[in-house]
C-alpha cells in the first residue's frame, strides 16, 4: 500500500496512522505525482549487520547537485535577535510536481539557499549536519527504477553542495532501510536507525523490528547499540544517548537513557495525570537535566490549532503523525510537563548553538521557542505538510 510505504519511508511508525490515514496519504501523494512504486521481494537476513563498503568504493549517488539558488524572506523574527543558520528539508508542490530540497536559512538576513534539490519522485527525510558544519548525512529514497539495490539509505554530501550525495554504505539487501541518522557531537560517530519490514517473520509481531546502530566516520563498521529502538539523540558531550524503545509485540513504548555505546540502558519513568502512549523525537535539554520529547495530546474534540489559526489553514488528521506537543521530564524520571499547546504533527527539535532556544520542525511549520515552551514564534510555513527535520548551526 503506497500510503503505508510513504509513511514508513518518512521514518514514522505504522501505529501513528490508521487505515484512513494511509489512504489519505496515498491519495495526496498520487495527486502530487510522488510515486514510490517499490516492489519488495521476500527473503530473510541475518540480524547482525555485515561489514560495509566505504563511500570511496561506492559510486551510487542521487545524481542532482546543489542549485545554489537563493531567495529572500522577511525576517519577521528580528526582535528575537536570532543568529546562525537552519539546515532543513522541505517539500512543496511546484507546477504539479512535488519538489524536495535541502535548504539553509540565514536567521540574520532571511536568505534561503538551496543546498540540494532531489530528483523528481525521490524522497529526502532525515537530514543531519556534522559538528564541524562541513557535511550532511541524509536519509534518501532514490526515484523508482534508478537504483534497484536501494529503497531508503544514508547518503553524505558537503554542505556547500559542491558534490552530489554519495551512498554512505551499501545496504546488505534492498529491503534494509536506514533513517534517523545523527552525528555524535564529537564528530566520531554517525548513529542511525535500521528497519526491514519483512524481517523477522513472526505471526505474533505487530510492529517492525527497529534497531539503532552507530559507525565510526569515516570508514567504520556498524555497531549494534539497541534492539527494538529508534529516534537516537546524543548529549552535548557525546557520553549519553536517549532514544525510544518499543516492544514489537505489545507496541509499548519507553523513553530510554543509556551510555553512548548502548550500555547501562535505563527507562525514564513518567508520572502525572496523563502519560502519552505515543512518544517521539527525544532530545536532551540544554542543561541536560531533562529530556524533551514529542507526544500525542489527550484525546479531545477537534478544535483549530494554534498553527491553523495563525496560518489560516486546516490540517488533515491523517498525516505522518498525530497532533502532538512538546513535553519534558526530569532525566531521572518524574512528572511530565507539557511545554506547548500547538497540536502540531511530526515534531522534531534542535537546540540553538547558545542553548537559549529550541527550533522545531512540524507538519504545520518551523517555529522557535524558549526552552520552557514560551514565546513560540513561527519562522517558516509548511503548507504541504512535509515531514522533515531541522538543525540549528552557528
Segments predicted by a language model, with ranges:
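Bacterial N-terminal signal peptides that target proteins for export
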Residues: 24-33
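Bacterial N-terminal signal peptides
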Residues: 33-42
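Sequence signature of WD/YWTD-type beta-propeller architectures
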Residues: 43-394
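Intrinsic-disorder-associated, low-complexity terminal segments enriched in Asp/Asn/His/Tyr and depleted
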Residues: 5, 12-14
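Short, Lys/Arg-enriched N-terminal segments with co-localized hydrophobic residues
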Residues: 14-25
